[in-house]
């Protein structure tokens, strides 16, 4: 499938783009937004979920240089809960993302869980959207671009790779390393 013209669900975290975010929403869509943003007049039939990102972050002892990143993890918990993603699935996903770094995985999950628990106690679901786990399909491969590129490189004969480890290509190379380890 290709890019669709309008979105069913949007997460708005940026004042500069919030109008465009709303413009891309379909009627009947859902807007999650950081409640410190000033929303423009909304003329669509959409469901709006404010997220108290800044207020919740004040309850967390986090390094200042990590605040923006952790705010994103916070909304993962809020949106995940409202969309019906089980908490253990979020935990497993974070553990996988930060495999080999258990302290980082735990600190990220603690922030996700804060958002999850907030939504569980404070947000009444009003929309029709849910994310469900699909049954396992043993005849198909489901992957992302980095993993697909890594596998293609390896099966294509890659024998040597050099890169600077903070470039955007790092994820692709780390995927290749994971495949040969």
Residue ranges and their predicted role:
Residues 1-156, 160-162:
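Active-site cofactor/cluster-binding pocket
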Residues 149, 153-176, 180-181:
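Extended, hydrophobic alpha-helical segments in both membrane/secreted and soluble proteins
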């Amino acid at each position: 499938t290709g890019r669709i013209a309008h979105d069913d669900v949007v997460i708005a975290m940026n004042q500069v783009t919030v109008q465009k975010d709303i413009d891309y929403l379909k009627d009947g869509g859902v807007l999650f937004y950081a409640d410190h943003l000033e929303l423009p007049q909304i003329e669509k039939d959409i469901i709006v979920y404010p997220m108290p990102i800044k207020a919740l972050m004040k309850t967390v002892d986090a390094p200042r240089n990590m605040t923006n990143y952790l705010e994103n993890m916070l909304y993962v918990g809020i949106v995940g809960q409202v969309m019906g993603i089980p908490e253990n699935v979020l935990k497993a996903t974070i553990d996988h993302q930060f495999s080999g770094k258990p302290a980082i995985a735990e600190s990220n999950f603690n922030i996700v869980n804060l958002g999850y628990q907030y939504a569980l106690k404070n947000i009444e679901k009003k929309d029709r959207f849910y994310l469900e786990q699909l049954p396992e399909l043993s005849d198909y491969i489901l992957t992302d671009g980095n993993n697909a590129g890594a596998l293609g490189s390896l099966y294509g004969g890659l024998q040597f790779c050099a890169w600077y480890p903070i470039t955007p290509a790092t994820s692709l190379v780390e995927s290749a390393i994971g495949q040969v380890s």
